[in-house]
Amino acid sequence: MPHFVIECSSNVFAMQPAAIILNTVYDAADSSGLFAPNDIKVRINSYDNYKLGEGKNSFLHIYASIMEGRTTAQKAALSNLIIERLAPLLAGISFLSMNVSEFEEATYCNKSLINPLNTDRNRHF
């Protein structure tokens, strides 16, 4: 955890390559101090088919899913940090946005948590 899922119009890659966008989001999340570097996961999905408002031709939105426990101020600071890092790289973009959603630790499961040897339920086992 966390997961940063980026959705964007494919024409965004004419402004910056996917690798630059991915690395910028990863580095910003890492520098926030909210997550262990090895826990951060960033991926990008681009779209050729989409409809935007008149005169608008590009978008990028980041959906962040993080484990519960951060304050509203920390989540807002994370969104602001990532958008501030991306904005200069995507100066011509029509829409640039992000939201942070939390999930409950009690309902979270991963491969480590189902390992019978992991008696402490350590999600990093």
Sequence positions of predicted segments:
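Short loop/turn motifs enriched for small/polar and acidic residues
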Residues: S9, R43-Y47, N99-F103
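Histidine-centered catalytic/metal-coordination loop motif
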Residues: S32-F35, K41-S65
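Short, low-complexity, polybasic intrinsically disordered segments
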Residues: C109-F125
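Mid-chain, well-packed structural core segment of small domains
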Residues: G53-I93
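N-terminal first-folded block
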Residues: I6-I44
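C-terminal structural segments of small proteins and small subunits
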Residues: A87-C109
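Macromolecular interaction modules
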Residues: I20-N23, M67, A106, R123-F125
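Short, hydrophobic beta-strand segments
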Residues: P2-S10, L60-I66
